[in-house]
Amino acid sequence: DLSMTGFDEKELTDLLGADADGEAKEDDFDLSAALEKAAFVQRGDVWTVGRHKLMCGDATSAEDVSALMGDTKANLILTDPPYGVSFKSASGLTIQNDSMKNEEFYTFLLSSFQRMAEHLEKGGSAYVFHADTEGLNFRKAFIDAGFHLAGCCIWVKDSLVLGRSDYQWQHEPVLYGFMQNGKHHWYSDRKQTTIWHFDKPKHNANHPTSKPLDLLGYPIGNSTQENGVVMDTFGGSGST
């Protein structure tokens, strides 16, 4: 009953327009362009956060990584790339480049490892968090980028991560190695083992697979000295 609106038929027609009963028409508004214009951070931006540097860039781009590192050589790589497992959190968070096909994913990893290796000191060590299901691609790319694979450490979590597998995952492997162009350095004792027990974060609304800080601090302490430079071109899963 139009009378209930307080307007007569002519007033409603003028208010709603002549096409009010027609189909909705697509306008020329470019949502992608508007979002890019509104974005606070742009590709190529390098932010100084205390003693740290954070870049919005491409881990496979020699130009981007060079812009970040300049003439500085990292003493250590501690990186947490996409695992290639199409991860999606319960809240809907996903990870970019986490759903590549086999050969494409290997090429992606190789290129990113090569970029990091170019800015690592001679004999510099590297730790790479990864998924067992993509272990072959990670190991092959790691070795092909010039690293010696010295071992694989295991992060044992305090609780399982519920997923689609028959056996629920309660660990993550971490490749450990170093560049073969020089002597690598070790700053801990000979009692450290390949099994790392650290509780996993309870929740992080900003990143679906963040690592606990004490977990990351452990290999950093073993493989660098105070004021060492640690590089992760994948943003440290929101941690480093």
Regions of interest found by a model, annotated:
Residues D1-T240:
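Core catalytic lobe of class I
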